[in-house]
Amino acid sequence: HTLTSALLTVAATLFGACNKGYVPDGPTGGEGKIKLQFGASDLVQHDTRGIATPAENTVNTVDVVFFRGQNKEAITPNSGGAPVGSFHFEATTVGDWVNNDPTTQTVYIPAKASDVNGTTAVTLINLPASVRARLAVGATDEITTVDQLTKAVSQTLATVEDLTTPLLMTGQTNVTFTNPATQDNKIDVNVKRAVSRLDVVLYYDWDKLIPNQQRGLYTFLQFPSKTFVGANADITGRVDGAKTQVADLTAQPAPLTATDPVPTSELPSVYINEYDISAKTASTDPAPYVLLELPAILGDGNPLNGIFPPPAGGDFSTTPVKSYYKVILPRKIERNCRYVLHAHVVGPGSPTADQAVVLQFTLTVRPWIETNVPGFDGTTHENI
């Protein structure tokens, strides 16, 4: 009974199986078929309202691994040969698709239904090649358990900006067939991106700021450094980004449309690993944050001149001072969602980074799809 894999519509280059020795249109001789269908409607670029970029929808490779309990199940392909530790698919072999047509979204994996029945199917999209190599039976440092796979994928980032496209996507499901001999058995797997996307929009409400004359600086700090296959709560490691200049003032594309007629800047989108520290204290488990260093010209006679150190030359009316702010992220970030923070700078910051003024913001949480993810309704929430 041949295992097949069916993807929902993908707004990216589709992939085909690289396993050989079987007929793309399906087996002959009356054998059954199993469809492995990815619940990946979030990869569909529905229309112009879609909030994911083509790069975020990209599917270059797919790897399917079967586990029985905690242990990897080596599967003997129908096409012959030794048992394999995983089934691998790529975007370049369209001839392996049903009817030689990738739009069918179905590809056959040469495995018997009876061999995979009762296992857990783990699907990994855009898996790093170094991890894939360790899935092979007999590989050096072979991955043989779920825990080992989790640790292998949980790579530590060197900087926040290391999380780039194509994005890792994962999903798993229990394989339960009432009758493995039945034609067209199907496995449904809900696949999600393993990370979320963060956008920060700055509103320069305070009239002493000069974003049209001199751009400020921002730094992503204390972000979680590990990406996990399954859901993750704790922040087990942290990483910082580089101090970077804020972009020029610019028009904002939907859904980042400005609501106030004030100068705005949008920080570059950044991908962030999920976490949940909502039940912990801020003193022991602080939330990640964005540090802002924004130039402001205070002017002569401003009471703030006694708080901020004199700028170069001592002229508060012509030379800007550095004003520091913090945008503290929510204490829970869930994978496969897009978080848009609208932060308003309504007054002076601090003259020092360690005492940076915390900005309030409105937070919009959107699934990376046009349909809802449970727990997120796409409405706006106030950070207080």
Residue ranges: model-predicted function:
Residues H1-G16:
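Sec-dependent bacterial lipoprotein signal peptides
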Residues T13-A40, V200, N336, I384:
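Bacterial Sec-dependent N-terminal signal peptides
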Residues E31-K35, T104-T106, D184-K186, R197, ...:
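Intrinsic-disorder/low-complexity, polar/charged segments enriched in Ser/Thr/Lys/Arg/Asp/Glu/Gln
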Residues S41-Q45:
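Short glycine/proline- and aromatic-enriched beta-strand/turn motifs that initiate or cap beta-hairpins
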Residues R49-G138, R197-V201, D205-C337, V373-I384:
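Tryptophan-paired
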Residues V94, S130-N185, P309-L341, V346:
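Structured interaction patches on ligand/partner-binding surfaces of diverse proteins
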Residues D188-R193:
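Short, solvent-exposed beta-strand/turn "edge" segments of beta-rich domains on protein surfaces
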